């Protein structure tokens, strides 16, 4: 899920199949030998062999629970953003209402800890009192709708996005939620670590209520009320694996049917306050969860619901209040749950806020300074090389029939590719940044986001809209638009290196591109057609063969012990593992195509093929705390970095050839037991 900053000369060489790069630049291997641990054996743990030196040289600092090459790029990006933002924040003549004024003022407000500490709980006091004043269930429904506008999401989440069955149109949808720990397992499982986190959460709730000015007795009542409601919501929620099934989470209905299916939910009040009075249809993602929401609202005493709603407000606002709120918030969510030891400095948190609120304003400045426009077209050519490679692989699949191949190739040919930055930027003119409280500005920003979102309901999908900002170090595939997107910030080493040859670049950014393409054909993506509709285009026999091959991947990752007594979740991580697998296969073939007429030489003692796999492994170098391993294993659809290497490569035949891996090596998997899909 990554890409890289690159410059013209290398880009031309990388993207012109068979071009002789030696004529244009003196290139290196791009592999930092210091990253290696040459005492390790490639066939015992390729991750340790390729990344052991990096891991040793980059011990975790207190502000991180996990730190790897992605985080290094994010740190670099954040420094760049700081320079851009701080320059505007230092000016006193920014025109009122201008982008410069909004960026500069929001940063200064976020940095003003003196004012924040003077205010204490004051910025949310009136809202807490308003919750106290709620008189009945109708008021509860009205408050849910109002609070969602401000970025607070009690009970459930409502959003607008493409209709999976009619992907050209946007639709209002609901999604389970309303639980402070975010994942249902924290409420339902009873192992020692989960039980400890649950106990710490209750202590956290009590401390936060007391910081907000409530006495201990009220704080303890709040703990009981919150845990009662959130545990009920958690029991009704779907698991992380169940949420990956697009058909199970598609339950579109007209408003008449909605009211019939959920008769005790006051939809009229909710939709009127939400600004959706004339809504015609909605998708209820998880019906059992929504039924429980209605049951909770109708059966839990009003006073307990008020405490739950007040907790939602306190929890949402904590990061934008005084230091004592921030410290307590960090203590639970970061220290207890993830193992972090120290909060990031205020400037980093402030930059992140400005980036989150005014992402495309900051992104436009970032692109103008750090990403040349010409790079966009060169990247498009590289993507086309990978598309060609994936097409070749699809045509050569022995297990797939011709009718399904034809549909797969049609889908591949219609990929919508986004590189670097959007062609059209968002208009933030309606967003006001004022010199009042930090939280008030965050609420206005959330209201602006909400208004923009609601305006899309029932309207055509804008396929030119970006779901990430240019300064985001990541990449994505969106099934309903059949698009792959590579923001500018990921276009830099170690993902792409202008001074390195094709072996390194195809091993790193090439695999990233192939990874995103393969998402269009993983266990979820394969269920969407070329137009982004949830529609079966597979023959029954081919679908069965795919599922059988995917199960091999599930079983392999289920067998991996990520911590003592804790195994990876092969079903949860299936889509990402298939994408890694496909990315490696597709990019390796593209690499061989690109160098067929001008073979690369051995450099630094490594063949081109070896450098390809070393570059891939180096992308996943990182350190991680035990608490974070356990947390991510519960909720993250991505495998841990180590296993994106040691779990992925044993399935790749060309890796065995490159490093002479044999039956005697611990990582060896017999050929007939390996995953073989794309």
Residue spans of the language-model regions?
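Noncatalytic, helix-rich "gating/capping" subdomain that lines the substrate-entry/channel surface
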Residues: 88-381, 385
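Bacterial N-terminal signal peptides that target proteins for export
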Residues: 1-7
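C-terminal motif of bacterial Sec signal peptides marking the signal peptidase cleavage site
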Residues: 15-18
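Intrinsically disordered, low-complexity linker/terminal regions across diverse proteins
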Residues: 226, 261-264, 283-287, 344, ...
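Active-site-surrounding "flap" and adjacent substrate/cofactor-binding loops of secreted or lumenal enzymes
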Residues: 24, 38-44, 49-114
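Bacterial signal peptide processing site
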Residues: 20-22
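Hydrophobic/aromatic-rich, well-ordered segments within soluble, folded domains that form packed cores
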Residues: 35-56, 187, 191-210, 402, ...
């Amino acid at each position: 899920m990554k890409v890289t900053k690159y410059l013209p000369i290398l880009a031309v060489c990388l993207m012109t199949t068979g071009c002789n790069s030696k004529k244009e630049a003196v290139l290196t291997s791009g592999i930092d030998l210091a990253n290696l641990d040459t005492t390790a054996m490639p066939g015992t743990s390729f991750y340790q062999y390729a990344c052991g030196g990096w891991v040793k040289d980059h011990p975790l600092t207190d502000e991180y629970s996990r730190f790897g090459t992605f985080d290094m790029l994010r740190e670099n990006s954040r420094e760049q953003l700081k320079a851009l933002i701080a320059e505007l924040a230092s000016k006193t003549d920014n025109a009122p209402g201008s982008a410069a004024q909004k960026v500069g003022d929001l940063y200064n407000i976020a940095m003003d800890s003196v004012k924040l500490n003077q205010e204490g709980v004051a910025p949310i006091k009136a809202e807490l009192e308003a919750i106290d004043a709620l008189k009945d269930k109708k008021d509860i429904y009205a408050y849910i709708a109002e609070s969602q506008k401000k970025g607070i999401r009690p009970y459930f989440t409502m959003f607008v996005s493409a209709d999976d069955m009619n992907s050209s149109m946007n639709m209002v949808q609901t999604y389970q939620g309303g639980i402070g720990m975010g994942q249902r397992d924290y409420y339902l499982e009873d192992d020692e670590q989960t039980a400890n986190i649950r106990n710490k959460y209750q202590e956290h709730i009590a401390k936060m209520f007391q910081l907000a000015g409530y006495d201990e007795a009220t704080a303890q009542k709040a703990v009981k009320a919150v845990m009662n409601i959130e545990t009920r919501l958690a029991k009704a929620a779907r698991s992380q694996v169940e949420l990956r099934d697009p058909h199970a989470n598609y339950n579109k209905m007209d408003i008449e049917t909605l009211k019939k299916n959920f008769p005790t939910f006051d939809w009229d009040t909710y939709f009127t306050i939400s600004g959706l009075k004339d809504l015609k249809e909605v998708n209820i993602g998880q019906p059992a969860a929504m039924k429980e929401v209605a049951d909770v609202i109708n059966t839990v005493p009003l006073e307990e619901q008020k405490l739950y709603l007040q907790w939602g407000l306190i929890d949402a606002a904590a990061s934008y209040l005084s230091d004592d709120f921030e410290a307590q918030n960090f203590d639970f969510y970061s220290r207890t749950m993830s193992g972090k030891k120290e909060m990031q400095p205020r400037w980093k948190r402030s930059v992140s806020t400005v980036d989150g609120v005014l992402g495309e304003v900051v992104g436009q400045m970032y692109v103008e300074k750090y990403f040349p426009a010409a790079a966009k077209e060169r990247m498009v050519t590289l993507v086309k090389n990978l598309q060609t490679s994936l097409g070749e692989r699809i045509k050569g699949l022995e297990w797939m029939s011709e009718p399904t191949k034809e549909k797969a190739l049609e889908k591949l040919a219609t990929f919508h590719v986004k590189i670097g930055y959007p062609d059209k930027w968002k208009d933030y003119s309606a967003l006001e940044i004022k010199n009042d409280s930090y939280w008030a500005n965050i609420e206005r920003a959330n209201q602006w986001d909400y208004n923009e979102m609601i305006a899309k309901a029932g309207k055509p999908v804008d396929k030119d809209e970006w779901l990430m900002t240019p300064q985001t170090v990541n990449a994505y595939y969106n099934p309903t638009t059949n698009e792959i997107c590579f923001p500018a910030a990921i276009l830099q080493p170690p993902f792409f290196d202008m001074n390195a040859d094709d072996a390194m670049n195809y091993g790193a950014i090439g695999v990233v591109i192939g990874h995103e393409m393969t998402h269009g054909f993983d266990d979820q993506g394969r269920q969407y057609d070329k137009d982004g509709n949830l529609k079966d285009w597979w023959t029954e026999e081919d679908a069965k063969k795919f599922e059988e091959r995917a199960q091999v991947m599930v079983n392999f990752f289920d067998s991996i012990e990520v911590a003592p007594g804790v195994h990876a979740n092969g079903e949860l991580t299936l889509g990402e593992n298939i994408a890694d697998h496909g990315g490696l296969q597709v990019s390796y073939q593209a690499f061989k195509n690109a160098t067929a007429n001008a073979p690369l030489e051995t450099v630094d003692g490594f063949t081109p093929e070896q450098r390809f796999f070393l570059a891939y492994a180096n992308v996943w170098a990182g350190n991680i705390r035990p608490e974070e391993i356990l947390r991510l294993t519960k909720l993250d659809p991505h495998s841990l970095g180590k296993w994106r290497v040691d779990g992925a490569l044993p399935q790749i035949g060309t890796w065995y050839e490159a490093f002479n891996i044999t039956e005697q090596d611990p990582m060896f998997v017999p050929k007939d037991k390996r995953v073989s899909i794309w």
